[in-house]
């Protein structure tokens, strides 16, 4: 029998998470229900952010972190779940850093992704 699983993350800010998902080119929707048609119960779960019909993020009210919600047995995405979380977390960190840099009066001059997938940001500020 198939069922929804949750994978913990340390992603806390919805707006930053949305930007990261959009940057990755993922189909984003908000406040939608995921439905698992496998089995007889047709399990449903409400998510704050959904990526299509089978992957979502739901806020854990206790930890204040968003958790990835999906059915791991019927995973259809070409990227494995753990790798997807790594990519999303990296983009989330870039978006969060960019926001904080701008708050302090800096401008991002360049952003470069190296062959090893590390990201290099160069920020400047006039004094």
Which residue ranges define each predicted feature?
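Interaction-mediating elements
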Residues: 1-127
């Amino acid at each position: 029998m198939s069922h929804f699983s949750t994978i913990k993350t340390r992603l806390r800010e919805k707006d930053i998470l949305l930007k990261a998902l959009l940057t990755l080119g993922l189909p984003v929707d908000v406040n939608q229900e995921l439905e698992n048609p496998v089995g007889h119960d047709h399990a449903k779960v409400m998510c704050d952010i959904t990526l299509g019909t089978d992957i979502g993020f739901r806020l854990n009210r206790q930890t204040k972190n968003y958790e990835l919600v999906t059915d791991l047995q019927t995973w259809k995405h070409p990227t494995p779940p753990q790798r997807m979380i790594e990519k999303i977390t990296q983009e989330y960190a870039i978006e969060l850093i960019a926001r904080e840099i701008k708050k302090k009066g800096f401008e991002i001059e360049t952003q470069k992704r190296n062959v090893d997938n590390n990201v290099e940001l160069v920020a400047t500020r006039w004094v």
